[in-house]
Amino acid sequence: MTTRMKAVAARAAGGLGPPRLRPGPAGRAAGGRPSRLRSFDPGRIADLEYRVWVGYYLRQWPQVLAASVGLVRTGFGMDWYRTLHGAWLVLRANQLWAPFPDNDPDRARACMRRLYALVKLSYGEPANPAKAAALEVDWWRAHREMQHATQPRGTGDELVESVTRLYGYLYGEPEAEVRLAAVHRARAMDLSDQWIREGCRPDSPLLPLEHAALVRCYAALLAAVHH
């Protein structure tokens, strides 16, 4: 991690996210409440992921790192050492995936496996970090193929299915319960892709729509897993 990126991460670390709860059986915290994996702020998560996406496509890596710190902290609620380590892994996975067509999916997958291994150390899940990483990078693949496809996609396309598989595995939920979240996420990606095609204008009216689609994604996901 460069000195500049360390400074960005340190600034981003100021108070993001609630304290970590100790997980109990079946994804529940010790007091019978849903674990931190199943209890999150959809608006906050959506805002941070939106910043990651915009920074990624503009290749503004310090912005990606800063938003990733908040995203990992808010999404997983791990201690700060694991949060900063996890955010760095997210950044590296994105950097390794970004080039087209000569990216490095194997190394990107390895970074995500290490991230999910940190989550497992904190909460005991996902059971298989390598499988979680494979499912994560698989939706990246599906999205990239969609970006370069000549035919428009439908509502039951491979991208929606790949995100559904990831959510179902991470939270141990039936795929039917998390599919709506995947549909909204795919819609956010559609809007992001259109924004890119139109020149990545910072004042584009597509950006608020993309942000709103991510909020709907995480609201639907919370409704499915918060128990």
Per-range role (PLM):
Residues 41-49:
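Generic helix N-cap/helix-start motif at coil->alpha-helix transitions
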Residues 49-54, 94:
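Amphipathic alpha-helical repeat scaffolds
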Residues 56, 97-100:
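Hydrophobic/aromatic side-chain positions at a characteristic register within alpha-helices
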Residues 70-94:
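Short, charge-rich amphipathic alpha-helical segments embedded
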Residues 112-194, 198:
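Extended amphipathic alpha-helical interaction segments
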